[in-house]
């Protein structure tokens, strides 16, 4: 990822509370962090997985053409009955026969269990963005919310295995701040 490709995704979140910053900037497995802080049962609830076109701001990062399909997977991470994170991942179609073929059958398993248990997987630095209604992921992230916020913080990074990448974007829902 270069600066031109990430012009509106920043290397550090600005104007954010220390509590929210702790969630956003943690480089470990978000799944494991939520599981440790969740007093209820943790679960992954898939809402979409299919070959699809990707968001405009993902094209250059993933080196995809506008008409090129990728596997798009969207899930909510729940603490009990409360969604705390909306996760969106993108894998180029051509990489589904290679390094990332195991992602097709993840179902309600966490992607983090695949990414953080393989020592060969490399991660780029996190990038951050405050999503508004103008971003396509904002409305998708808000589907499970009773009240739509004015904005939502998101982070994303590339995970690479054998030269093939998956882009993972995590959108933090307001309820994440209620976890101890």
Curated annotation (Swiss-Prot):
Localization (cell): Cytoplasm
GO cellular component, one term: cytosol
Primary location: cytoplasm
E.C. number(s) listed in UniProt: 4.1.3.40
Record keywords: Cytoplasm, Lyase, Pyruvate, Ubiquinone biosynthesis
Gene Ontology MF: a single term: chorismate lyase activity
Enzyme class: lyase
Catalyses which reaction(s): chorismate = 4-hydroxybenzoate + pyruvate
Transmembrane segments: none
Family label: Belongs to the UbiC family.
Protein name per its UniProtKB record: Probable chorismate pyruvate-lyase
Organism: Nitrosospira multiformis (strain ATCC 25196 / NCIMB 11849 / C 71)
């Amino acid at each position: 990822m270069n600066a031109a490709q990430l012009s509106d995704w920043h290397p550090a979140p600005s104007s954010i509370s220390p509590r929210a910053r702790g969630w956003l900037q943690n480089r470990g497995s978000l799944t494991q962090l939520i599981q440790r802080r969740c007093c209820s049962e943790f679960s992954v609830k898939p809402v979409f997985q299919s070959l699809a076109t990707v968001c405009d701001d993902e094209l250059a990062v993933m080196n995809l053409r506008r008409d090129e399909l990728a596997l798009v997977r969207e899930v909510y991470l729940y603490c009990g009955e409360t969604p705390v994170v909306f996760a969106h991942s993108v894998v180029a179609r051509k990489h589904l026969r290679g390094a990332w073929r195991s992602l097709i059958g993840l179902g309600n398993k966490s992607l983090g269990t695949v990414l953080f248990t393989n020592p060969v997987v490399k991660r780029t630095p996190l990038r951050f963005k405050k999503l508004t209604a103008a971003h396509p992921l904002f409305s998708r992230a808000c589907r499970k919310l009773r009240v739509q916020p004015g904005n939502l913080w998101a982070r994303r990074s590339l995970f690479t295995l054998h030269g093939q990448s998956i882009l993972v974007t995590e959108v933090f829902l307001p309820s994440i701040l209620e976890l101890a």
